């Protein structure tokens, strides 16, 4: 977490002089967060039902997908807008950005947006995607997707995108609140089991993640990112 925070703090200034390095650094450190979460899973899966919770299930699935890199999925929104294409290519386009708010009202200041239809392509058997995760059987995959949809309220995001006529590939989901929610749940389970948090980083994050932060997965918040002809893209509430 600390490395991602530090990279995020440097992002704005570095982006002004080297957008590619700034975006690469941020994306790679987010992948490091996912790898660290997988390590957390390895050592604590006996203490917490990872696959019974939508947030932890999504993180492990996205981590595995990015780790194996046998598909073109899960490029960040920053990468798509500024590196995969020129920003001018999107002049006049709108993107629907979905995120999960906190219950204490103070928003999470960092974000990592990926296409929602990438998540569907990887996890939803009904999409019949060539990039579908085939590690689990079809019946289990259906139940997994149903649990994710129910707990993260993804159908509400898809419905809003359809109603407002957003192309499917312009609907994005913020993984950062999902990550925070997942870590909070696991840390609380570990604390309840009497696991000691040792080391500077562990001690620093133990308190906020076990007693201060809580994410509301039941009510996704929606914003619109509008790409204009002048200046940077603008984000507004919808």
State the predicted function of each range.
Residues 18-48:
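Long, hydrophobic/aromatic-enriched structural stretches that serve as scaffold segments
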